[in-house]
C-alpha cells in the first residue's frame, strides 16, 4: 500500500502539471489489482497514460510488470478519484459467488472479475481487463457481439463460445438482480474477446 500511496502522489502531480514524459521506477510491490500474485513493477510511464472520457476523468496507466516466473507483460490500471469502497465490496461478493459455484456446484459460468483497491474514501485503483471492450465501443465500431467473439476465437467452435457467452450473461443478470446493481448501460457493460 505504501508504494501505491507514493504512486498516487505522482498521479496527482501528473494531473496537476500535465507531465508528458515522466517515468517512475519502483521496486517489488504486492499488486493491488491482481489477487494472490506478486509482481515486480519494472516501469510505470505516463507516455501512454490517457484520461478516460467520463465524469470522474480517471487515468489509465500503462505498466510493465514481471511475474514470479520472470515473464514480462503489459498491464493497465485505472486511477480514479471516487469512493470505490462499495464497488470493492460488491466485486469481492461476486468473486466469492464464483468460487462457491465452481467449488461446491462444479459450475463454471465464465464470470470475469477484476480487483479494486480503494486508497481512501476519495480515490483508488481498478484493474483493467485486457482484451475487452464496452458494448458501446462495439456498437460504435459497427461490430455485432457475434462477429466480435467469432473473429477473436477462430480455434473455438461456435457452440463453445456461445455457451460461454450465454453462461456469463445469465450469471451477470442474476448477480446484478441479487445485489441490486442498477445503472446498466452500454458504456459500463463489457465483453472480453473470449465472450
Summary of predicted features, one role per range:
Residues 189-191:
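Hydrophobic residue at the +6 position relative to the catalytic HRD Asp in the kinase catalytic loop
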Residues 1-34:
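Charged, compositionally biased non-catalytic regions
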Residues 21-181, 193-195:
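Conserved ATP-binding subdomain of kinase catalytic cores across diverse folds
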Amino acid at each position: 500500500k505504501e508504494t501505491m500511496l507514493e504512486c498516487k502522489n505522482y498521479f496527482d502531480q501528473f494531473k496537476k502539471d500535465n507531465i508528458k514524459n515522466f517515468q517512475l521506477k519502483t521496486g517489488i510491490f504486492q499488486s493491488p489489482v491482481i489477487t494472490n500474485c506478486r509482481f515486480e513493477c519494472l516501469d510505470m510511464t505516463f507516455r501512454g497514460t490517457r484520461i478516460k472520457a467520463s465524469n470522474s476523468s480517471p487515468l489509465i496507466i500503462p505498466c510493465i510488470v514481471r511475474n514470479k516466473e520472470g515473464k514480462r507483460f503489459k498491464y493497465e490500471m485505472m486511477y480514479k478519484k471516487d469512493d470505490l469502497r462499495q464497488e470493492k465490496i460488491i466485486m469481492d461478493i461476486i468473486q466469492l459467488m464464483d468460487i462457491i459455484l465452481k467449488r461446491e456446484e462444479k459450475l463454471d459460468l465464465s464470470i470475469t472479475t477484476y480487483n479494486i483497491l480503494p486508497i481512501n474514501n476519495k480515490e483508488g485503483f481498478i484493474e483493467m481487463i485486457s482484451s475487452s471492450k464496452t458494448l458501446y465501443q462495439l456498437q460504435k465500431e459497427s461490430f455485432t457481439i457475434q462477429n466480435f467473439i467469432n473473429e477473436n476465437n477462430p480455434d473455438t467452435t461456435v457452440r463453445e463460445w456461445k455457451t460461454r457467452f450465454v453462461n456469463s450473461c445469465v450469471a451477470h443478470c442474476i448477480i446484478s438482480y441479487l445485489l441490486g446493481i442498477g445503472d446498466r448501460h452500454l458504456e459500463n457493460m463489457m465483453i472480453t474477446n473470449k465472450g
